[in-house]
Amino acid sequence: MKIIAGGCSFTYNNEMTWAGEVAKEHDLTNMGSCAAGNDYIARSVIHEMDKHESNIILVCQWSGIHRRSYYINHQHTLHRDLVSGDWPDWAGDYTRINEDAVKQQEFWIKTGGNNISKPGSSDRIHNFFVKPYAKYFYSEEQSLVESLENILRVQYYCSSRKIQNIMFWWKKELENYEMSRYSKQLYEQVLKQNTVWLEDLGSWCIENTDLLQKDLDEGNHPTLEQHQSYARQVVLPSISKLM
């Protein structure tokens, strides 16, 4: 059975996250990407699932609703400035996960950050992409709607191909926002789908390890040992039940 993992930096890199512990027992492809939002995560896992005919299970970790991704090619006003670095974690190409995205002719910018006001790994990305969006376009309701639509998109894809899927959030996310009528309806649809939902990674680690809430609030990640405990006690048993 093939396991396809998706997510942000809470999933990226088998050596540092829960995905590595799962990979010890299963054939796993890790599509996790640093700074990824839920739009990028959805695209990446659908792209990878589409390469396999059968016998796959999706384990997808969802990220912050404030995060977005933007398509970049040589025609983009900021292209020359953006490609000046080497392998920045805010750039991604889910079709070539083992190559430097900014060396490709086209790639994606991932805004990252712990919330809409706190920069991620790059002040440049925050100033060019996040600040203008936050000033003129951002709303919690629209971000909820778009994230839930991305989750539904993955769920519908899995349903159409009868792919079993497991999902969880990076930490408490939806609980931080008040849903309005648009997002409430979508959330009800999400819960109706044939998905195994797990407790979010951050909350589980706070309840079962020495991770503190303030660490998560400050943008820190669970340690490798905490990730491994979550994998052994939560993710792997859930996978076993589906096999």
Give each language-model segment a name.
Residues 46-243:
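Alpha-helical cap/lid subdomain in secreted, periplasmic
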Residues 1-52, 223, 228-229:
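Serine-esterase "nucleophile elbow" of acetyl-processing enzymes
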